[in-house]
Structures are given as C-alpha cells and as structure tokens.
C-alpha cells in the first residue's frame, strides 16, 4: 500500500491513524482496537467488516 494513500485514510470509528500490516493484509486502528481487512488491494473500512485486535497484537 502506498504511503500517500495510507496518509489519507483514517479509522472510521476514531478518525485516528492506521497502521498497515502487509503480512496480514490489514489496516490496524490501535485506538479502536480493530483490524480492517484489505482484499484484492481494496481496504474495507467498515466497522462491521473489521475484526477485534487481541491484547497480544496490541502489545507487539
């Protein structure tokens, strides 16, 4: 994912910064504790599409 694109995207819940995790193809919002999936290069930025982040993931 291009950095300039990532700079524009924000978490739809918190409006905060997102982290790109290439290995999992996800965008993480640490504030909302949610991981938004990226499918075929398209980020799905809907709260109901996100999975909750576990405490172990947040501490890493």
UniProtKB/Swiss-Prot annotation:
Pfam families cross-referenced by the UniProt entry: Trm112p (PF03966)
Domain of life from the UniProt record: Bacteria
GO cellular component: cytosol
Disulfide bonds: none
Family as reported in the entry's similarity comment: Belongs to the UPF0434 family.
Descriptive protein name: UPF0434 protein NMC0623
């Amino acid at each position: 994912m291009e950095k300039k694109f990532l700079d524009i995207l924000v978490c739809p819940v918190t409006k905060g910064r997102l982290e790109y995790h290439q290995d999992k193809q996800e965008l993480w919002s640490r504030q909302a504790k949610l991981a938004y999936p990226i499918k075929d290069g398209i980020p799905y930025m809907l709260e109901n599409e996100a999975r909750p982040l576990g405490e172990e993931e947040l501490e890493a």
